[in-house]
Amino acid sequence: METVFISVVLMIASLFLVSNYMVQGIGGMTSSLRQFGMFLLNKAPAGLIDLFNDKSGSGTKTWLRFGMAWFLMACIGMFLGIWHRYDPTALNSLSSIGWSYDDGSMLTDYTAIFFSTALNYLLVGAALVAVSRASKGRLASEASASMVAVLLTASTIVVLLLPAIFSFIDVSNEASVLEIIQNISMFVVGAMLHIALLINVFITIGDREHNDISPTTWFLVLALVAKIMSMLFIFFGELVDSTQTVWMAERVLNGWVPLALIFAVAYHIIPFTAGRPVWSE
């Protein structure tokens, strides 16, 4: 249990430090770090970032559109699963194109990935809309937000296609190699992309039109920090075979993070629709 306590302490400390710096700032380094952050968002990676539009709202729209696309894939996977349970021979004709349907476990896993990815895109996209509305109507870098959304989808697709790719090649220790590559693509790359998004959100918060930080902003930032930390914990926990660390990080990634994002969206939609704050003053 020591590793669990250490991981929890590190995560809580990270959340505390981020919360403290959001309120107190970082003194004279604020301007320099903002310029450096904007340079990273607008210039890195060179060439690729130029392919994306920096028009106001384009980044949040990209997140929401990808969320709808992943949700459609989840619906298709769910439909195929229900159909196969109703008629186990319904998909046998697909063997003519070289694909045979087994017990449905892989389809179930893929559908779960589709749905969790869709949920992440839709909730983060909706929260980004709320944050941008409080900061001059745009994110610090809409192009960077769009690029992160595209690269995150590409990383997820790589994870989904790797088992099929490895079925055509002969690799020693195939299972372990496949797991390592999938973990790098899903957790390490995913964490780096979410760090870029977090930097974007931080700079956007710095451009807000009032001093107060909204509950939506708090929930979004803390959710992103918790997600980044849990992804890294899962990767390094798998690397050193620390099952307790992986267990704890998965609880955070699959439980705390979606809940925080749901609260982030709710704390914007409810007051915006009702015309009054969630909690009375």
Which role fits each region the language model picked out?
Residues V171-A175, V240-Q244:
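Membrane-interface helix termini and inter-helical loops of multi-pass transporters
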Residues E2-P45, K61-T89, S96-D170, N183-I205, ...:
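Hydrophobic cores of alpha-helical transmembrane segments in multi-pass integral membrane proteins
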Residues H210-S214, T245, T273-E281:
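Hydrophobic, small-residue-rich membrane helices and short re-entrant helix-turn-helix hairpins
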Residues S176-N183:
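Hydrophobic, ordered structural segments
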Residues D54-K55, T62, N211, W218:
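Generic detector of short alpha-helix boundary/capping microenvironments
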Residues P45-T60:
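Cytosolic juxtamembrane amphipathic/interface segments immediately preceding
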